[in-house]
Amino acid sequence: MNGEAKRTRLDQRRAPIHEALENFRRMRVVPFDVPGHKRGRGNPELTAFLGQQCVGVDVNSMKPLDNLCHPVSVIREAEELAADAFGAAHAFLMVGGTTSSVQSMVLTACKRGDEIILPRNVHRSVLNALVLCGAVPVYVNPEVDNRLGISLGMKREQVAKAIAEHPNAVAVLVNNPTYYGICSDLRAIVKMAHEAGMLCLADEAHGTHFYFGNGLPVSAMAAGADMASVSMHKSGGSLTQSSLLLIGPNVHQGYVRQIINLTQTTSGSYLLMSSLDISRRNLALRGRQVFHQVADMAEYAREEINAVGGYYAFGKELCNGDSVFDFDTTKLSVHTLDIGLAGIEVYDILRDEYDIQIEFGDIGNILAYLSIGDRPQEIERLVSALAEIKRRYHTDGTGLLSQEYIDPVVAASPQEAFYAPKKSLPLRETEGMVCSEFVMCYPPGIPILAPGERITKEILNYIEYAKAKGCSMTGPEDPDILHLNVLA
């Protein structure tokens, strides 16, 4: 292919799925296929709610629109454009959220009995994948910031030690960044993994903007990682549940497609795919400018919130060259314990009394997620609300827990524990037993307990405290979490 043809094919102004849907809309095709709402005519209430523009392109795979399971035309073009925009060898459009991207990434790298090196503060989707494939986690317990009570990144020395002690591990997985914006030394970890013959996988659910930002942490593809799961819907502007799976040149594209097709729907949503296509175009053309503005807004918010007093909106000052190698300056994470309120309490007050919905609140912190749709006036409203909350609710904070992360005691693999014979016991009677299910606050979706981990008094205290403070707890069969399933 000559250079001119290549430039035309990779013209980032194009959005081939979007263009194909617009052409299809003009064709006025009579539908005798699914979906059964028939362009909205069969469900007028849905059409009134979502709009004709939306339901009119909620269509099934067909020749002019390609097929997500085996793309050969417009979806293939959209994937090539995404790969070009993100600096990847190939990109896969994912419609099962970044959960499906992460699981496909782990299932590609690991088989039953394989070891994978990873931090324990991973999203539940990583551990779910281990339940499915039977791989065995080798945890690198992250450093903890004792003031903030949050887990940090993996230290280079810890990763090197894990690789040396587990030379047959097949991969190292890295959060880039964590929910709080903390980044490990990704380039160094990639180098260590590759020198040991291992893949390096990156969970970039919260790092889409790294590919389009000046002064932001390094992206996984730029660092040489082999695979990366990217939540376009979080900071990239696409619809919820849409995601990208990026791979480097040393990963077999065809095999990854087979892995994806094991679990991803055969009825890919064109609403989600076109949103990925349009959002990729937007980021490729305007992303650097937009995310520079987002970082500026976040920095302004940090300064204003810290000026209120009592709160600590943290940033790059946490960087220490290792466990906090870099920090995502678009993240607005705020420590709340010094005003005497848990993060989840501030979260609830903001929503219930000020009509401000932030991303999450945990034991000691809140996160306000800033991205391409935010404006300065919303920042001012958030800062004013936090100042008023401090004035109205400030207390001495006696009895507040401060630690968000508890080192696990692993007694069995996730798959072994999940499928083993089990029994249900009252919460306080489970101390010392091995858990067979997940327990987590969502968001952020990082398990407090995972299958195969021993239940300690410290963990039980944390669960009861989080419940009492109003954290949304998920995972166990018992929705009230009065009982837990343990190995029989």
Describe the predicted segments one by one:
Residues 90-116, 129:
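Conserved beta-loop-alpha segment that forms the PLP phosphate-binding cup at the N-terminus of a helix
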Residues 300-475:
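Conserved C-terminal alpha-helix-loop-beta "cap" of PLP-dependent enzymes
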Residues 219-258, 264-275:
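Active-site PLP attachment segment
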